[in-house]
A protein has these predicted regions:
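Charged DNA-binding/catalytic regions of mobile-element recombinases
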Residues: 1-212
């Protein structure tokens, strides 16, 4: 991290007032993504590991894979597959990850080949990877803690539906109540008189939009 901050034009001096890590995230938000695993236990006592990437600027989530055995080789291949799905001019320069054994040197090499520098978060400092940690809590609160997961097929279906809801419809305070995929920053020119609603994830979440 002490090599990354100067490259971004930020003084990492220890006696500097304020949080240099927070300054780095703010100044480089559009170039920063974070990666982590969310663990999901099923009713049949199986544990699945959901690998995901989240964009710091938009909070957009990209699921990268689900497995019961997240080895280093599997995680590296999942990262390779995800990078192939991203737009060629994605603009990401930094990826924040923790020190889990699944994030091997081969994982970092795949990122380097795509022009992305891996930054290892400080041990026992969840705030260093706050975007990923926050999404795991949101996923649990809005989905996993409110339903029973039986198997991988059900988990994949629910996760796909929830991520679509999260990216396209869930408002965020940091984005002035806009969803990650919402790029429209204009405000309505007239009052909204009627609202339509649709439920997702078996009725666990609601989506609202102005009626035609």
């Amino acid at each position: 991290m002490w090599k990354i901050l100067p490259a971004a034009g930020i003084d990492p001096a220890r006696d500097r007032t304020g949080s240099t890590w927070a300054e780095f995230i703010r100044s480089q938000a559009t170039a920063v993504i974070a990666v982590d695993f969310a663990c999901v236990d099923t009713a049949l006592l199986a544990r699945f590991h959901v690998l995901f990437v989240i964009e710091a600027a938009t909070r957009r989530v990209h699921p990268a894979g689900i497995t019961t055995n997240p080895t280093g080789a599997w995680t590296t291949q999942a990262a390779r597959n995800l990078l192939m799905r991203l737009p060629e001019e994605h603009g990401f320069r930094f990826l924040v990850r923790d020190g889990a054994g699944q994030f091997t040197a081969a994982f970092d090499t795949v990122l380097t080949a795509a022009g992305i520098t891996a930054i290892r978060a400080t041990a026992r400092s969840p705030q260093a990877n706050a975007f990923a940690e926050r999404w795991v809590r949101t996923l649990r609160h809005e989905l996993l803690d409110r339903t029973i997961i039986w198997n991988e097929r059900q988990l994949r279906a629910l996760l796909a539906e929830y991520v679509d809801h999260y990216n396209r419809h869930r408002p965020h305070r940091s984005r002035e109540q806009r969803a990650p995929d919402d790029v429209d920053t204009t405000t309505p020119t007239r009052p909204i008189e009627r609202i339509q609603r649709r439920t997702t994830c078996g009725g666990l979440n609601n989506e609202y939009w102005p009626a035609a």
